[in-house]
UniProtKB/Swiss-Prot annotation:
Keywords: Cell inner membrane, Cell membrane, GTP-binding, Hydrolase, Membrane, Nucleotide-binding, Protein biosynthesis. It holds the Pfam family EFG_C. Required for accurate and efficient protein synthesis under certain stress conditions. May act as a fidelity factor of the translation reaction, by catalyzing a one-codon backward translocation of tRNAs on improperly translocated ribosomes. Back-translocation proceeds from a post-translocation (POST) complex to a pre-translocation (PRE) complex, thus giving elongation factor G a second chance to translocate the tRNAs correctly. Binds to ribosomes in a GTP-dependent manner. It is found in: Cell inner membrane. The lineage of its organism: Bacteria, Pseudomonadati, Pseudomonadota, Alphaproteobacteria, Hyphomicrobiales. Residues 7-191 form the tr-type G domain. This is Elongation factor 4. GO terms for biological process: positive regulation of translation. Gene3D superfamilies: 3.30.70.240, Elongation factor 4, C-terminal domain, Elongation Factor G (Translational Gtpase), domain 3, P-loop containing nucleotide triphosphate hydrolases, Translation factors. The gene is lepA. GO terms for cellular component: plasma membrane. It comes from Rhodopseudomonas palustris (strain HaA2). It catalyses: GTP + H2O = GDP + phosphate + H(+).
Length: 603
């Protein structure tokens, strides 16, 4: 089977905000072009969302790809390579990766909700990648749909001409054939030279139990054939190709992949570390010298410790993280130890949803029971002797007297919210030490830009934003700069012992409120022991908040009937002595729920 003529190939991705229907549109495109039969599609929604967790939450986490055959109205046969991308801000890395492999994008906007913050972010990614963009209005069959208003919004906010936007309902299939024609007529074919030396972009890689590492590639020039020896230019590792093929969405093997095509290769690669996303693949015998411009590697923004509840699970956790790292290039981890929690890992994530998803995948796919420590960001510190250091973990913070300056990362947040919730949204941003930059109106919705410290966003900002706006506000952010900050290290002491897993860096003005909220929450969740347990929040040697868990008390005087008071007193004194001793040597068991709840408190 020879590869298709390059003019008849269209590589495109679907960009949209969460829940605007891009995975459903992908289902319809697969169905209409015959990628899967109606029988195979029956009872299956979001075909490309292969993880259970993706279907349950209704979000796309991993970018997926599928190849479709389509006979257009002009009578020619076309090949479409569709990349379904995530919409959530944490997975922007997956988006940029997919966009690098395509020439065009379908911009899907919900006709009842309009342009959202992450729609904007993803469109800008697509424009940066030099894409041709076709606007598609989805859910036009809903009673609340306002297509004309949304078209105007696309023109006002994004600056795209939406006069010939395609009107569809992905759920019912209405207008979807028009999308297929628009892909043919309005998106450009890829460029490439079949006779040139092999040059291909490594788009993604994941681990398959039977095949080893599977690599998703986009061929730019030349041809990839079975049996060919290839070289990864970034890692300098060479392999013999065993299988070459594409997804329909099922894995289908072919003899070769030509320029402009997107497909997969397997080559007995054992280490996913050898396949760096964004790397250039070339022919080992006739290598090219210039690498393709890769995309920027993902930089972890949020760090937290993950520890197994059962210490015997440590090796299982190490293996599980290695496997997830195979499929998720943006996830990083290194070993760490904690006095309270034993051995575990310090992990880096792109954001809080990313953290939650990884944690959930570890517990589901590998049956691990984990404790997560307080999420933190990267702080830069200048010491009094002039040296500079970066801190990922509050436990590593040097002595206060040695620190000349602490700098924390700031972000620029773009929030789109219906007008009636604007006051609550602005108050939330002010409470989080934000500085308002601009406020504009798009119809009945306000678009507000704020500078915020990332430290204030990583805990629960997204949840709070959703609750103050009844779920209507959308949010997107990017890192801007580091600024000096008045931060202090707050520790939580349980029975006078610091719990390192709960220490955190907080702004001095918010330390007391946060400390009080945490100790109150811990008091509710630590079960009573045989002795009194003080729970304290401290900055340095100063206690800023305290709660006490009352002791369980056995009635030692129960069998004394009347008689002399000294007998009772003697028994009570004896009990008191015993409790004193217990408190000295007793160990307090802190349940996992107490850790999780303490980290989720809002000061």
């Amino acid at each position: 089977m020879t590869t298709a003529p390059i003019d008849n190939i269209r590589n495109f991705s679907i960009v949209a905000h969460i829940d605007h229907g891009k995975s459903t549109l992908a289902d319809r495109l697969i169905q209409i072009t015959g990628g899967m039969s109606d029988r195979e599609m029956a009872g299956k929604e979001q075909v490309l969302d292969s993880m259970d967790i993706e279907r349950e939450r209704g979000i796309t986490i991993k970018a997926q790809t599928v190849r479709l055959n389509y006979r257009a109205k002009d009578g020619k046969d076309y090949i479409f390579n569709l990349m379904d991308t995530p919409g959530h801000v944490d997975f922007a890395y997956e988006v940029s990766r997919s966009l690098a492999a395509c020439e065009g994008s379908l911009l899907v906007v919900d006709a009842s909700q309009g342009v959202e913050a992450q729609t904007l972010a993803n469109v800008y990614h697509a424009l940066d990648a030099g894409h041709e963009i076709v606007p598609v209005l989805n859910k036009v069959d809903l009673p609340a749909a306002e297509p004309d208003k949304v078209k105007q919004q696309i023109e006002d906010v994004i600056g795209l001409d939406a006069s010939d936007a395609v009107m569809i309902s992905a759920k019912t299939g209405l207008g979807v054939p028009d999308v297929l024609e628009a892909i043919v007529t309005r998106l450009p074919p890829p460029q490439g030279d079949r006779s040139a030396q092999l040059k291909a972009l490594l788009v993604d890689s994941w681990y398959d139990v039977y095949l080893g590492v599977v690599v998703l590639v986009r061929v730019v020039d030349g041809v990839m054939k079975k049996g060919q020896r290839i070289r990864m230019m970034g890692t300098n590792a060479a392999y013999d190709l065993e299988r070459v093929g594409y997804f329909t969405p099922k894995m289908t093997s072919v003899d070769e992949l030509g320029p402009g095509e997107i497909g997969f290769i397997t080559a007995a690669i054992k280490e996913v570390a050898d396949t760096r996303v964004g790397d250039t693949i070339t022919d080992d015998r006739k290598p090219i010298t210039e690498m393709l411009p890769g995309f920027k590697p993902a930089i972890p923004v949020v760090f937290c410790g993950l520890f197994p509840v059962d210490a015997d699970d440590f090796e299982t956790l190490r293996g599980a993280m290695g496997k997830l790292r195979l499929n998720d290039a943006s996830f990083s981890f290194e070993m760490e130890t904690s006095a309270a929690l034993g051995f575990g890992f310090r992990c880096g994530f792109l954001g809080l949803l990313h953290l939650e998803i990884i944690q959930e995948r570890l517990s589901r796919e590998f049956d691990l029971n984990l404790i997560a420590t307080a999420p933190s960001v990267i702080y830069k510190m200048t010491l009094t002797d002039g040296t500079e250091m970066e801190i990922h973990n509050p436990v590593d913070m040097p002595d206060v007297v040695k620190i000349a300056e602490i700098q924390e990362p700031w972000i620029e947040a773009t929030i789109l919210t219906p007008d009636e919730y604007l006051g609550s949204v602005l108050k939330l941003c002010q409470d989080r030490r934000g500085n308002q930059k601009e406020l504009t109106y798009v119809g009945a919705r306000a678009m507000v830009k704020y500078d915020l410290p990332l430290n204030e966003v990583v805990f629960d900002f997204y949840d709070r934003l959703k609750s103050v706006s009844k779920g209507y506000a959308s949010f997107d952010y990017h890192l801007t700069e580091y600024k000096p900050a008045d931060l202090v290290k707050m520790q939580i002491l349980v029975n006078a012992e610091p719990v390192d897993a709960l220490s955190m860096l907080v702004h001095r003005t918010r330390a007391e409120g946060r400390g009080r909220a945490m100790v109150e929450k811990m008091k509710e969740l630590i079960p009573p022991h045989m002795f009194v347990i003080p729970i304290q929040a401290a900055i340095g040697g100063k206690i800023i908040a305290r709660e006490t868990v009352r002791a369980l008390r056995k009635d030692v005087t129960a069998k004394c009937y009347g008689g002399d008071i000294t007998r009772k007193r003697k028994l009570l004194e004896k009990q008191k002595e015993g409790k004193k001793k217990m408190r000295q040597f007793g160990k307090v068991d802190i349940p996992q729920e107490a850790f999780i709840a303490a980290l989720k408190v809002d000061s």
